[in-house]
Amino acid sequence: MSGVLPVRARAQGVSPSLAGIDLLQVLGDGVVGAPESAPTLRDPGRIARWETGEWRYRITSGARSGQTEVESLALISATARGETWKRTIGQESTLFLREVSGGGLVLPSQVTHPHQALVYFEPPLSYLIAGLGPGESRTFDGRMDVYSVNNPGIKWYTGRIRATTVYTGVYRITTPAGAFRAALIKTEYQIDIFAVVSVKDTLYTFYAEGIGKVAEAEHRRIAAMGLFNSDTKVGKVLVSYTPINLPTRVESP
């Protein structure tokens, strides 16, 4: 079955404590602070600052600890799949997204640069979900088709993906760019390919209204039967954000 399944939200109130969540330790001491009251996410694009701009992050753990990673967001001409936004995440990946009714965003395709892979999601993968109440979740089930980015006519494989997104609550987050009241979105991905390769990816992403993503902790586990296994944890915190003002369009008379 493909699509998105809802889970009921809890009433608005103080967000649950994040104490005991080991993954958040990769962000460093003093980053994640006290829980605060959490409203419904009526406009996730506003919380995530879905506008052209550039965000610079400091990597706080893993092999690249101390390095800077740049993320950018840009408008593009509509593609054949209706994508009108491009989000570039360092040298790791480029996401192509489109807006949907109600204020959310979906991810029809992405490029994973280290593997030179072009990935199509069917149906498009939920990316930002409008209307989530605190504690509410959505589960997405779908298919992913993976092609060579250098030769899109060559299909490498097909897999299944399940994504569970939870709006956990709102928390005080302190980064080199400042202190923020930030909404926490937890996303868990389960990817299975040929019943041979299994990928489990967990992300805790903090968004501050008017700024966008201010911190993120990720735990990725890859198991390939009889081939290899990997287990990596990466944290990043915001250092700076620069909006990019697009030139005003002048219509011909």
Q: For the regions a protein language model found, what residue spans apply to each?
A:
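Contiguous hydrophobic, core-forming segments of folded domains
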Residues: 80-148
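Acidic, serine/threonine-rich low-complexity disordered tracts
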Residues: 5-96, 148-253
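N-terminal export leaders
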Residues: 1-2
